[in-house]
Amino acid sequence: MTISSSPFHVALHEAKHSAFGTSVGFSVTAIHVAASQGHVIWSNNFPVPEELAWLWPRNPEATTTLVRHAVATLLSPHDGDQFPTLCHDSILVAQFGRAWYGLPTVRGDVPMPWLVLLRQAHAAVRSWYQQPGVACTLVQLAHHLARAGTLDAQEWTALWQCEYGQWLRQSTPAGASTPPMPLRIDTRS
């Protein structure tokens, strides 16, 4: 994503994406931060909108959770608020919305209204961001990313496990569980 700001602001943006996504179970392949742009490359467990029609009939509950987590990950740099301008993140959220609206009723399972799912994603980001230590830890992570420039999966995993994950993990209510993520098909070839 191109951001008109300092390398630190770019790094903070990407830190929020990568930390929130990792906290809900997505795997990072690489993180790139440059002077005016950055991006996170996700592994195959981060969904793409084109997969929803295939995933939904197989496991509607897990697909709903997967999409909520993916959309929240895209919203995370904005702290749960609306996108200030049109950007790659907002375009991808809109693509998820279009794909979601096209899902059929399956065995009585009706996709929840998109705006409800979107509100839940916004609320999840706000709740995560307000956990003790998250905002400060994200700033520290952003400084690390700005200095490093690029992290591969192994470097990110080491950082997450040793330094940042303890503060940035999602708090889960006792007894709560997350449905298993559906198997992913490769639709990009």
Cite the ranges covered by each PLM segment.
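Soluble catalytic regions of large protease machineries
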Residues: T2-S189
